[in-house]
């Protein structure tokens, strides 16, 4: 039994802390959730993103897509589950989950977005990085709570945090894809 849980029903009271309100998360719809009825994929990603599972209930397609690709190895120029690069992953995700077509390269994706500040990032925005010191050279898709999904050269498709030392120093900005 954990704090806030009801041992008879297995439900857990959602944490309505101000950090979720600051993210614009729909606190008015949060309440109790029966853990046994929660989709395992959503539960997994709620833990990874450090947010209440209720927030993910309307985004099942996004997290099922991420789950299907998670761990896919990085391959420069790749565009399938045998290997994919960062811009291939972001364009595939945007097309399949959000029905938005974005260009194939990270540089072109950056040039074809409405720029947004880090504090304005919303789920589905693109996040851009200057990895090589020559402008945009890496892209990911923003999720929530400072987390983004991307195809990392070292780890393949993973979720990372914009606050991590490496990514915080390489972050160039965010972009909202034009529909």
Positions of predicted regions on the chain:
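Intrinsically disordered, low-complexity
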Residues: 1-72, 178
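Structural motif
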Residues: 124-125, 146
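Catalytic cysteine-centered active-site loop
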Residues: 72-123
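Aromatic- and glycine-rich peptidoglycan recognition patches
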Residues: 1-10, 136, 143-179
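Extracytoplasmic/secreted envelope proteins and their assembly/folding machinery
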Residues: 59-63, 67, 87, 91, ...
């Amino acid at each position: 039994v954990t704090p806030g849980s009801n041992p008879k029903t297995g439900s857990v009271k959602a944490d309505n802390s101000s950090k979720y309100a600051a993210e614009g998360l729909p606190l008015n719809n949060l309440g109790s959730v029966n853990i046994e009825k929660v989709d395992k994929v959503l539960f997994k990603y709620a833990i990874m993103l450090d947010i209440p599972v209720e927030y993910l209930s309307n985004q099942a397609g996004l997290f099922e897509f991420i789950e299907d690709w998670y761990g896919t190895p990085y391959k420069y120029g790749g565009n399938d589950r045998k290997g994919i690069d960062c811009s291939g992953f972001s364009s595939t995700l945007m097309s399949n989950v959000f029905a938005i077509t974005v260009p194939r390269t990270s540089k072109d994706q950056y040039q074809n977005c409405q720029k947004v500040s880090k504090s304005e990032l919303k789920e589905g925005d693109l996040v851009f990085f200057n990895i090589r010191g020559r402008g945009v050279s890496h892209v990911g898709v923003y999720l929530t709570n400072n987390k983004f999904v991307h195809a990392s050269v070292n780890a393949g498709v993973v979720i990372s945090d914009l606050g991590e030392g490496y990514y915080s120093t390489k972050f160039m900005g965010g972009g909202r894809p034009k529909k």
